[in-house]
Regions:
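Bacterial N-terminal signal peptides that target proteins for export
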Residues: 1-8
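Pro/Ala/Gly-rich low-complexity, hydrophilic intrinsically disordered segments
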Residues: 102-109, 471, 475, 482-486
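Short, P/G- and charge-enriched loop/turn segments at secondary-structure junctions
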Residues: 41-43, 76, 420-422, 451-456
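A short glycine-rich, aromatic-capped structural motif
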Residues: 45-120, 134, 139-143, 147-280, ...
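Short, structured beta-strand segments at or near domain termini in extracellular proteins/domains
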Residues: 461-476
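A short, compositionally biased domain-edge/stem linker segment
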Residues: 34-47
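Functional-site microenvironments in short loops/helix caps that host divalent-cation chemistry
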Residues: 25-33, 55-56, 62, 67, ...
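C-terminal motif of bacterial Sec signal peptides marking the signal peptidase cleavage site
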Residues: 19-20
Length: 491
């Protein structure tokens, strides 16, 4: 009887402990004079749910393949890790969404040329001063519409972005001119103690005498376009002089490489995809391919710029769009139960014989799952995190550099291994982790923990991407807010 009473008491104690994990004291101040009660921070920022994204709540994961690959004898690192919550695109970025990026870049070039004296010099397309008449850095006025009936100079500005094939006579946009310039501030490098501007802050060990004349060298990415329209990207090593040294500049040609359909499959008749996959509206809701890791990052930067221009003062709280880390991707793909696949069993077909994903079921048989190449995004069921196509369709870029050590070389808190390869670096240092498998891959490659890689400048017909965005706040309250995103309309 005593044992029963003790067991009941212990059970009640444990239950009370669990239910009261976050039942701490209220943070409301009493306002008592002379006491430290904290300052009023105002109303907490309620982050609006991003369109087409779903919330992946923070959690724990045993990352990697626990069952090692017996076929190749390849060992995959396994490690327990934790990641913070983040927003993630429900589907891969589609042709339609990427076309919006392409058209924005096209229109920005047209507006810039309309303001150029060589094309008429209409200065109203540029904003050069603020509302008070004070000068500002010149930038485009997107509120001014492009002319519907252009004059001769304006027509030349429009025509300058198009080319005519001398053989077929086809007129199309000149993708070689579609360059997007963006800047990324490297907060991590700027925060490193060794990069402090004040020498006294670089080492807190009072036994060490700090050299006030020490020269700190930093690496800075920069880029420019020469008079022939060629992009030159450089990594400069120079002495640290100020906070601007951590602002990196990139210029990326953003038009997808449609020739990847031919180059990826030699002795194969894929001309139809080369000509139609990106340009034909039939493929609008298919995942964009032929996009390099560098172009995917440019899209994330543009998407951030596009969003922030539409927000008010609260824009400072919103985090930038980016590619997921390798750890975030696997955590999101494996769902709430850490499944081997993005569904709740180890089969690739459901009870009705329907496949869970678009992949290559049999040798030489791409169509067994109902598809030949890619499929429309979101036609297969979502995983427990509300994410579609986390297995198959197209493999996906991550932000993480690929190494054999994988997660073993990373921290167990928000793991990431980042390396900004300079142009002169060996090519092997430009490998980026790719996850998820694709329409051309067998079953074993679409497992959520399967790792592979591709060079960051290599476009493929089977690699796409999706974006993530860190939560504006990682507090328990924030994780409960806005669970549902504004859903995409699927066609």
């Amino acid at each position: 009887m005593k044992k029963s009473i003790v067991a009941i008491c212990l059970g009640a104690l444990v239950l009370g402990t669990l239910t009261g994990c976050f039942a701490g004291k209220s943070t409301a101040s009493s306002g008592r004079g002379g006491e430290v009660t904290g300052v009023g921070g105002g109303r907490a920022f309620r982050e609006p749910a991003p369109y087409g994204m779903t919330l992946v709540k923070r959690g724990w994961l045993r990352m990697g393949l626990e069952k090692q690959d017996s076929l190749w004898g390849k060992k995959t690192p396994v490690k327990d890790i934790s990641v913070d919550g983040f927003w993630m695109d429900e589907t891969e970025v589609t042709n339609s969404e990427y076309k919006q990026f392409v058209e924005w870049v096209r229109d920005s070039i047209i507006r810039t040329r309309l303001a150029d004296p060589a094309y008429g010099g209409d200065e109203s397309y540029m904003i050069t001063e603020d509302k008070n008449g004070d000068p500002v850095t010149p930038h485009l006025d997107w509120n001014k519409r492009l002319p519907r009936k252009p004059n001769e100079d304006e027509q030349r500005a429009f025509e300058s972005l198009y080319v005519t094939n001398p053989v077929t006579g086809e007129k199309s946009i000149d993708g070689r001119q579609l360059n997007y310039r963006f800047e990324i501030y490297d907060y991590t490098s700027a925060a490193l103690r060794r990069n402090r501007l004040n020498p006294q802050e670089r080492n807190l060990n009072t036994d060490i005498t700090v050299d006030p004349n020490e020269v700190v060298m930093i690496s800075k990415d920069t880029a420019y376009v020469d008079e022939n329209g060629v992009i030159h990207s450089e990594t400069i090593n120079r002495p640290l002089t100020g906070p601007w040294d951590f602002l990196n500049t990139y210029i990326i040609n953003i038009y997808p490489d449609t020739t990847c359909w031919v180059n990826d499959f030699r002795n194969s008749d894929n001309e139809i995809y080369l000509r139609n996959y990106f340009s034909n509206p039939t493929y609008n809701n298919y995942p964009v391919v032929g996009v390099t890791w560098e172009q995917a990052n440019a899209f994330c930067a543009w998407r951030t710029e596009y969003l922030l221009k539409g927000l008010g003062k609260e824009a400072r709280y919103v985090q930038r769009y980016r590619l997921p880390t390798e750890a975030e991707w696997e955590f999101a793909a494996r769902g709430k139960n850490q499944d081997e696949f993005p569904w709740d069993n180890q089969n690739v077909k459901n009870g009705n014989g329907c496949f869970y994903a678009n992949f290559k079921p049999d040798r030489g048989n791409y169509t067994k799952d109902g598809n030949l190449i890619t499929s429309k995004v979101g036609i297969y069921g979502a995983n427990s995190n509300g994410l579609y196509d986390m297995a198959g369709n197209v493999a996906e870029w991550t932000s993480t550099i690929y190494t054999e050590a994988g997660v073993d070389a990373m921290n167990d808190l928000n793991p990431q291994l980042d390396y900004k390869a300079a142009k002169e670096d060996p090519y092997r240092l430009k490998k980026k982790s790719v996850r998820g498998g694709s329409w051309k891959d067998p079953e074993s490659y679409i497992r959520s923990a399967w790792r592979t890689w591709e060079y960051q400048n290599q476009p493929r017909s089977y690699i796409g991407f999706r974006c993530v965005r860190s939560l504006a706040s990682s507090s328990s309250e924030a994780a409960k807010e806005n669970k549902k995103s504004s859903k995409k309309k699927r066609r």
